[in-house]
Amino acid sequence: MEQAPEDQGPQREPHNEWTLELLEELKNEAVRHFPRIWLHGLGQHIYETYGDTWAGVEAIIRILQQLLFIHFQNWVST
C-alpha cells in the first residue's frame, strides 16, 4: 500500500503566528506614516464589522497593505 512521504523539510511557523507577526510589522510601519487617530478609527471600524475574528485580522492586513502601497507609490512618484 502506498504511503505519503514523511515531511522531511524544516518545520514552518504556524500560519496564525506568521499572520500576527505580519500584522504587527504592518502596524509598526503604518504608525510611521499615518496619524494614529486615523489608524485607531480604522481599527474600530474593523472591530465593529468583524469582531475579534481571523476575518478581521485578514481585513486589516489587506487594508494596511493597500494603504502603505499607495502611500509609497505616491511618495516615490513625486
Swiss-Prot record:
GO biological process: DNA-templated transcription; monoatomic ion transmembrane transport; protein homooligomerization; regulation of DNA-templated transcription; symbiont entry into host cell; symbiont-mediated activation of host apoptosis; symbiont-mediated arrest of host cell cycle during G2/M transition; viral penetration into host nucleus
Subcellular location: Virion; Host nucleus; Host extracellular space
Chief location of this protein within or outside the cell: virion
Keyword GTP-binding attached: no
Region (Homooligomerization): 1-42
Residue ranges that the Swiss-Prot or TrEMBL entry lists as coiled coil: none
Subunit field text: Homooligomer, may form homodimer. Interacts with p6-gag region of the Pr55 Gag precursor protein through a (Leu-X-X)4 motif near the C-terminus of the P6gag protein. Interacts with host UNG. May interact with host RAD23A/HHR23A. Interacts with host VPRBP/DCAF1, leading to hijack the CUL4A-RBX1-DDB1-DCAF1/VPRBP complex, mediating ubiquitination of host proteins such as TERT and ZGPAT and arrest of the cell cycle in G2 phase.
Further comment: HIV-1 lineages are divided in three main groups, M (for Major), O (for Outlier), and N (for New, or Non-M, Non-O). The vast majority of strains found worldwide belong to the group M. Group O seems to be endemic to and largely confined to Cameroon and neighboring countries in West Central Africa, where these viruses represent a small minority of HIV-1 strains. The group N is represented by a limited number of isolates from Cameroonian persons. The group M is further subdivided in 9 clades or subtypes (A to D, F to H, J and K).
Family note: Belongs to the HIV-1 VPR protein family.
This protein's name: Protein Vpr
Organism: Human immunodeficiency virus type 1 group M subtype B (isolate BH10) (HIV-1)
